[in-house]
Amino acid sequence: MDGTLWDSAENVAKSWNEAIVKSGLLKKELTTADIQGVMGKTMDVIADILFPELTKKMRMSLLEKCCQEENDYLREHGGILYPGVAETLAELKKQYGLYIVSNCQKGYIEAFLDHYKLWDYFSDIECYGNNLLQKGENIRLLATRNGLKKAVYVGDIQADYEASKQAGVGFIHAGYGFGTIDDTVPELLTFEELLTFNQRGTIEGAMREL
């Protein structure tokens, strides 16, 4: 989702800084680069990285405040939606079931879908915040829940690739996102290029039987 459909890092940083000030737990200002550096990690790991000066209990307390502030802020203000996302999803939806799996907190995907009014394009969503499962487990869970026979995951960082392998699905790299992949896989230069991939059969070719 992050680095694939949009870049929310700047507004996430703004919202977390608001939450930090309100909490009074520490004096710290996060940057967009700080947030980009932890994109794709589970929320507990993010708290450990960004708030090492706090005890575990205090980190998790602040994390909860940050996540709530973030969800509310993004629902209202959004982030940077990559070019052609809505149009590309509309075309792909005619041929495929579309799903979102993320390591984010509960409510983050919903805030994204609410702001951009993209609910109609997705058949199901799942995230770490709902069940504390790792991304590979959630990809498999969602595939099983929806009776998928084959699937491919589009992601931007190495952890996404590892999760897709764990889940037994194919992988397409969003090369315009936040990371690189240490293997040879189909790579997108833009999200819109998925339509070209589809015309060439690249999406179908990247799928793996489940």
Could you tell me what each predicted segment is?
Residues 72-100, 110, 136:
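Short, acidic loop-to-helix structural element flanking the phosphoryl-transfer center
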Residues 38, 80-84, 104-105, 130-131, ...:
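Short beta->alpha linker loops
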Residues 41, 69, 94-95, 149:
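Structured helix-beta-strand junction loops
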Residues 4, 102-104:
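Conserved phosphate-coupling serine/threonine residues in phosphotransfer and NTP-handling enzymes
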Residues 1-83:
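N-terminal helical cap/lid subdomain that shapes the substrate entry/recognition surface
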Residues 106, 110-210:
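Asp-based, Mg2+/Mn2+-dependent phosphohydrolase catalytic module
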